């Protein structure tokens, strides 16, 4: 059984972080703003990232035959796999009707759904920051049920917003949460490897001590 945290046991946030008003509409205007002329992630950069993630999975002897792309947006991850790993089965999902109609995804919500069969690689690229605390807990529970191999996750934290992100290109209508808040939820079912990669605790993969984050 997959452990999960009930809302009353979720990691606490400071009051000022609870007042953030995240975006809830991901329509054509959203995609024009963040993915058109000056996107926060270009197709070339996502291709480099996908190449690296896929190669690291191969290095750890986790052959990627199946992929779930959550909040797939413009579909850059799916397109990379279709172009370079035609044998891999990719399921791309999104909660945006516009994204599903425009880019060809399935209209599914990871907070309330998971596939019947788990997959080798789950991608959750810039999704969790839009969800409520309870929504993140539900999403991570379903992600853990979806993944028996590797999870790639990117989510901007409070520190990232202060020190890392390009504030002109990044959507700032999101929840501001600390990295430790997300780690506490993820660590119940995943082991942090680094560079956004998390290994399912169901995976029987021996890692050198310095390949993963300290416990």
Predicted regions and their residues:
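A conserved beta-strand element that flanks and buttresses the S-adenosyl-L-methionine
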Residues: 123
